[in-house]
């Protein structure tokens, strides 16, 4: 049976560590100008029910760099617009392509598609998780600090899909997540790992950041939330990552943001544009991690690493 990549909690530490090592290797080879095109004749279908910049470009570019082709589909241009079921969509598309990436809202739609698909399915984002983003982030941390095992990652802001993937990764890979969220915007207990040793809660952003190796956040307009944005931003104002928060972290702490960012809201300009910020390396590494992931799903482990 083919593998899917839907949620980090479904992966083993061996699998994730292999993918991270392989992504770093593929990036190195790409930067050296080496041509590596194992996907000649392979096709990736990219199904978008949510808008995207980085997800689309990174998957499309990654497939091209590996010698394959990517086909872009959105809801408005498919029969999903006319209420064709996600199951029937999966049954049809998966007979025509080698791999499918889906960016959607309800995680259950992703799971329903994967259940009927004849080819591997990748989670490009749901309201519950964003595994490719977090694995690209972890790859970036490893490049800068060699290992994430035992590290402290601080999340500042409301609990969302990216945080849930951080928690799953922490449970599998052995690091700790410190969380500080506005009242009413903390985690949903049904969406966190059973291993509660991998995270702690703090009332203030500064307390959460104390001793952190990495501070990360997301914008206050997170995918999947349609409530009044003014109310959300008002409640979140105290949870901005700024110079005060970063000073509470370790002196060499990194700052990450999954983007898009809104300077002056969830993060101050002096932090995201400052020397501790690695957001552009982080954005680039989505490309390289996803190349390693697609290679693994289509070809299995490659041992020249």
Kindly give the residue locations of the regions a language model identified:
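A short, aliphatic-rich alpha-helical micro-motif
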Residues: 94, 114, 148, 208-210, ...
